[in-house]
């Protein structure tokens, strides 16, 4: 298995009962820029790919205020693939069907036209804050249907399949690893979201 590459067949999840999924459209920067006008933003994109934004919910809510990025930062979280597709191969990169299946069940289904902020707006805004460099990845957000909303979470052996129109599908098998961490210490307020 490839654990830190663009795409791999297995995704190690830490020994936690509350690891969640989010399918996302990922833009990969191909031309550096700062203060990029919205109308020129797509000129800075090398291509798009599918991203599986994996989140360990207890790690996110372990502190006050919550630190959402912390729960997404474990080794092997955030696989991307199956290929980097250039914008000229897509009819409209701002309107692509997006879907996630967990163990064969469709749990997320939408279109990137439903994003709160489209790709161009996100790139332009971010470039006002930080310079964008070649190879930077911008994850654009996820539709409804993440596991925490229904009390469903990734387990050892689960298959997660994420697809975006024109970009292909990426399938990963979840493999549980032990890491001697505070994996299942759940903050009190979060317990109402979780089902036994």
Where are these regions (language model features)?
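A generic local secondary-structure boundary/capping motif
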Residues: 14-19, 24-25, 33-40, 68-72, ...
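Short coil/turn connectors at secondary-structure junctions
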Residues: 15-16, 21-24, 43-46, 94-96, ...
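Catalytic-pocket segment enriched in acidic/His residues
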Residues: 10, 57-196
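Structural signature of FAD isoalloxazine-binding scaffolds in flavoprotein oxidoreductases
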Residues: 4, 19-21, 25, 156-166
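Short beta-strand segments
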Residues: 20-30, 51-53, 141, 164
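Single conserved hydrophobic/aromatic residue that forms the stacking wall/gate
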Residues: 1-13
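RNA pseudouridine synthases
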Residues: 29-31, 36-51, 57
């Amino acid at each position: 298995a490839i654990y830190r590459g663009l795409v791999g067949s297995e995704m190690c999840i830490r020994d936690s009962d509350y690891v969640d999924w989010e399918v996302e459209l990922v833009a990969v920067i191909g031309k550096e820029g700062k203060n990029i006008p919205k109308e020129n933003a797509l000129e800075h994109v090398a291509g798009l790919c599918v991203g599986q934004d994996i989140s360990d919910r207890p790690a996110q809510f372990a502190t006050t205020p919550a630190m959402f990025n912390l729960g997404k930062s474990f080794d092997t979280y955030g696989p991307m693939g199956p290929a980097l597709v250039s914008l000229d191969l897509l009819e409209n990169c701002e309107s692509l069907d997006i879907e996630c299946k967990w163990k064969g069940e469709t749990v997320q289904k939408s279109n990137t036209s439903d994003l709160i902020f489209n790709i161009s707006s996100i790139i332009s805004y971010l470039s006002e804050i930080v310079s964008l460099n070649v190879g930077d990845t911008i994850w654009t957000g996820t539709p409804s249907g993440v596991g925490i909303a229904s009390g469903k979470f990734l387990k050892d052996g689960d298959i997660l399949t994420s697809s975006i129109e024109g970009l292909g599908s990426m399938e990963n098998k979840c493999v549980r690893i032990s890491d001697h961490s505070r994996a299942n210490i759940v903050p009190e307020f979060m317990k109402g979201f979780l089902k036994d």
